[in-house]
A protein has these predicted regions:
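A short, N-terminal "cap"/entry segment at the start of jelly-roll beta-barrel domains
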Residues: 1-36, 71
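Conserved short histidine dyad/triad with adjacent acidic residue
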Residues: 24-25, 38-55, 89
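Short, surface-exposed secondary-structure edge patches
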Residues: 41, 60, 75-77
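Glycine- and acidic-residue-biased ligand/ion/polar-headgroup-sensing regions
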Residues: 57-69
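A cytosolic small-molecule/anion-sensing beta-strand core signal
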Residues: 64-65, 80-81, 99
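Short acidic-glycine-tyrosine-enriched beta hairpin
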Residues: 74-89
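Ligand-binding loop in jelly-roll beta-barrel domains
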Residues: 89-108
Length: 108
């Protein structure tokens, strides 16, 4: 049984192409989820958001396309394609789509 699901194995793929932005929505695709790690691909339509919450583990965001605004413990960070942001465990954080954007979220 594979640990990573919902994506082809042993193929070179464009990661951003594995999910589509849908108007007025936040779309997600989970690649891995267990007690130790989660890996989820997100596509945000401009203006959409995930409200403030916290996480049991450190969260690493890798922005694939577009620009997202992340608020971590009250500090705002504007991240564009190619940027990485670490959101430490237990710190409140939120995400806002400054424009259509895609990101990979890994929580450990």
């Amino acid at each position: 049984m594979p640990y990573i699901k919902n994506i082809a194995h042993e193929e070179v793929l464009p990661l951003a192409g594995q999910i589509d932005v849908q108007s007025g929505q936040v779309v997600s695709k989970t690649f891995a989820q267990n007690a130790y790690v989660s890996m989820t691909l997100f596509a945000f339509s401009k203006g959409e958001e995930i409200s403030t919450h916290d996480s049991h583990g450190d969260a690493m965001v890798f922005v694939l396309e577009g620009t997202g605004q992340f608020t971590v413990d009250g500090t705002q960070h504007l991240c564009k394609a190619g940027d990485v942001l670490i959101m430490p465990a237990g710190k409140p954080h939120a995400v806002f789509a400054a424009e259509d954007f895609k990101m990979l979220l890994t929580v450990i």
